[in-house]
Amino acid sequence: MKSIKELCELRDGALEVRVGEQIENLEEDIRGTDGRAFFAGTYVTRGLEELVRKAVARLAGQSSCAGVVLKQALGGGKTHLMKCAALLAADPELRREVMPGVPHINDFGAARVAAFNGRNRPPGFFWGEIARQLGLPNAFTTLEAPDSGAWKNLFRRAGGPLLVMLDEMPPYFEYYATQPSGNGTVADIISNAYTNMLVAARETGQAFMIVSTLEGAHARGSRFMNHALRDAVNDGERRMLDSVTPVELEGNEIYGILRRRLFRSLPPEEVIAGVAEDFRRSLEEGVKAGVLDAAALQDADSIRQTYPFHPSFSKIAALFKDNEGFQQTRGLLELASRLLKSIWQGSSGDACLAGAQHFDPSLADVRDKFRDIARLDGALARDIWNEQGDAFAQELDRRNGHACATRAAMMLMMSSLAENAGAETVRGLAPRELFRYVTAPGAAVAPFREALEELRGRAWYLHEEDGRLYFDRNENLTSKLASYARNAPAARIRELLRERLLETFAPAEKLAYASVLCFEAPDRVRAALARERVLYIAMPGDAPTPEACMRALGDFPEKNNLLLLYGSRGMGNLDEAARRVYAARRAAQTMGNGHPQYAELQERLNNDEHSWNAAVLATFDSLHYFHGSRFTVKKLDTSGKDNGEIRVR
């Protein structure tokens, strides 16, 4: 199957989109903008169509709805919709070209348009600026808030259909809330003027208001604005303002925006349909194999609307859309630009659909964008990618000869960017979700499953909660255990090993030997040999060879009483296993039963204990003893018996 890099043509600058360069200024942009060129790069969302329908009906004198409130976070497309409405209201011919099917589209001519951006603070306040734009600069000669009568008089004198837009007002209210006036603040005066303006618009037949809020930002200013809106709407009889959401990030229309803004051309519909069918076959195979749930087949149905992006892209982005500072539509557009850069210029040129797994962490722009959304630098550098090439995912991919670990980790990273704490916050993906999203024609799921299991065991910042895997700023249990193991005192590790050897080879039947000595001084060994047959366990670090160990014991007559158990191989593995057990035991001392990672710790401790036992028996596999006067050696039975005494016997 051909990649999207082969089938699609990008617009100029599609790989270098920056949030700051996309910010629109309503007051500046509606003057002198080429409407046709503007709409050539605009995708008509449901929110835009709804806004235009309501505005046109009101401006044509055919609706009692006097305005709308655009609700979405910063960067959610509110200003863009206002700009669309302004251009269409002022240009009858453009209206007919762009949205010919809207009712009443031909029922009025060019509307008067006034726009105010709340990040500006003109000396005559917002009401003076609106009056100036309507051609009546002297309508409000004082700084007192106009009452509804004064506003109605302004609208009447301006004449004709009238569109008034107020964008980003919470910062405006917030600033004036710091300016005292009488028993309150200037913001109280502005709030009164704002309410009066909305009430006047309701009572003026062809006046339509568009106002925007900033959800999740400027809390104090938003409270003033919302209070003014409630005062204007709550007349007990009529609903004056409707709410419109510019873009639904969870739906498919965001893909229409991305396609329109980033791509010059896409392949024909029949090619896209073929891609969808190929993905369907791959998903069906996964369902039959029990790797995927039947719901995964829905992705194939969505590809025609989301191509060249995977349907999961907006679903994962929706997890962090409410992050403070993430500018929703603008932010997602920049994020998609970084994804395409990973495909066109990075390591993911084979992508048949652009998904979160294709972000290339070696690109500085990708790392910077992820850092802007949520600072997970530690997770990225330790677990996924760093310039030294020793992040866990990099090591796994080098060993396995594919990029599945990095790609799985990048998908989990994108799903982990939500920062708002609370019961509603969801981070991460369940393993079956990840397998669903990485399933593609010619891409087996098995390598991803194996890579994910290794990441779960080795990554320092990968956590699990309610079956979902996610990266966090805080190190996980793996990291804590690694630190304990790394800093374990050598003397304590030696003592742990001694205790385990004494336990493993303890003589219950006493048929082969009567007692065990481990890492003891030569004089103690000789004293024990004078009494009974002894299994003496020696550490290679104490004597380089069994013969050297015998020489260290010196001369003793009871040579037939000696069985020397010597570690012949794997001492490094044994030390590592002992350190893991030490770390797990130490962590268990600090965790109570109610700790969220207690069950995981107990499972690890059991596994580490079992691995240590196996390492002990595999290492100490060489039994040396005297047969007559000859010092001989016997390899112990390693057929799986865990009882050391039975192995020696």
Describe these PLM feature segments.
Residues 1-76, 80-649:
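Extended alpha-helical scaffold and adjacent linker segments that couple domains
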